[in-house]
């Protein structure tokens, strides 16, 4: 498939032929993801930072919340929306999220062209070790990142490494021994590519990005509490106005809107996955009024909590 791809010199291959080869490679990788999905439960113990993505059902534009990670697709595509920003990720563009981020997403998938790929959680310790090995190399000069979500060209090097990762996942011993090293290789290519600054910001200290990331971690741990903008600004050691500006540059939304969206997503997970009643979920995430929660839930997701839960049950039944 991609055997010896590290040694191939794609620059001397005519573009049309190269694109045809890549398209065929991605189709084969999508098939491999589909086959591996049946083993995902056993694989999660061997490679906990890898999650396989596969689906044949399209989804209209809807609010989602992604945790930090790298998303690589081989088939199908998604379009994300954050305020005025629109970004597409597919077999040519990977997505990097460095903060937990609510946004709207549209999924394009069919049985003929499924959504297939993988998601890598970023292990901060592994990233720090990689940076220590790179050291003060003069060739490593990533630009600093301002946003928590970025996309970039899915290079031949990353695609080749992703293929080898899927390959070792077919054999438990290979997955356990070789998997983390291949993930490290993918991290290296992301770190030295266009999104390197965004990845570097995860372990940098005292930059605006790192300070806002610390605030987002506080929200993640304390979202049920009555958090004020003043408290969060103090956590970042910023004035309220500077905090607003820097928070929006990272998340593309205001602090209070982010907190509200975060609570709504957490409540939705409790309702859908834990079978919790809407009123109980509302109280659990910090709402004092169940009716206010239901209004804001419908305004954000476009359906009531009950309608959303029924829709998800129907989809799972199919």
Curated annotation (Swiss-Prot):
Identify the InterPro entries for this entry: Homeodomain-like_sf, HTH_AraC, Tscrpt_reg_HTH_AraC_N
* Gene Ontology molecular functions: cis-regulatory region sequence-specific DNA binding; DNA-binding transcription activator activity
The record's annotation in PROSITE patterns points to: HTH_ARAC_FAMILY_2
Q: Share an example GO biological-process annotation for this protein.
A: regulation of DNA-templated transcription
Annotated HTH araC/xylS-type domain residues = 213-311
User: What is the protein named?
Assistant: HTH-type transcriptional regulator YqhC
The record's DNA-binding region positions are 230-251, 278-301
Gene name in the database record = yqhC
One Pfam family name is AraC_N
Keywords in alphabetical order, please.
Answer: Activator, DNA-binding, Transcription, Transcription regulation
């Amino acid at each position: 498939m991609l055997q010896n791809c590290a040694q191939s010199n794609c620059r001397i291959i005519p573009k049309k032929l190269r694109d045809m080869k890549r398209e065929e490679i991605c189709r084969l990788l999508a098939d491999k993801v589909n086959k591996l999905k049946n083993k995902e439960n056993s694989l999660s113990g061997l490679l906990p930072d890898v999650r396989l993505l596969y689906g044949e059902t399209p989804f209209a534009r809807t609010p989602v919340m992604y945790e930090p990670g790298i998303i690589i697709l081989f088939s199908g595509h998604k379009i994300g929306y954050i305020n005025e920003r629109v970004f597409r990720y597919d077999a040519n563009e990977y997505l990097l999220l460095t903060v937990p981020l609510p946004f709207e997403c549209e999924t394009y998938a069919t049985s003929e062209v499924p959504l297939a790929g993988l998601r890598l959680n970023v292990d901060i310790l592994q990233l720090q070790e990689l940076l220590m090995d790179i050291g003060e190399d003069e060739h490593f000069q990533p630009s600093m990142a301002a946003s928590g979500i970025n996309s970039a060209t899915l290079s031949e090097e990353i695609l080749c490494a992703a293929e080898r990762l899927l390959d070792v996942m077919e054999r438990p011993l290979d997955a356990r021994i070789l998997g983390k090293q291949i993930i490290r290789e993918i991290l290296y290519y992301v770190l030295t590519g266009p999104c390197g600054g965004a990845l570097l910001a995860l372990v940098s200290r005292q930059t605006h990005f790192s300070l806002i990331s610390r605030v987002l971690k506080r929200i993640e741990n304390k979202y049920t509490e009555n958090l004020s903008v003043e408290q969060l600004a103090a956590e970042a050691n910023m004035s309220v106005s500077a905090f607003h500006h820097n928070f929006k540059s990272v998340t593309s939304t205001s602090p209070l809107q982010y907190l509200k969206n975060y609570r709504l997503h957490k409540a939705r997970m409790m309702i859908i996955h834990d079978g919790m009643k809407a009123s109980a979920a509302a109280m659990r995430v910090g709402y004092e009024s169940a009716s206010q929660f239901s209004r804001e839930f419908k305004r954000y997701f476009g359906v009531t909590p009950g309608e959303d839960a029924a829709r998800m049950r129907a989809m799972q039944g199919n």
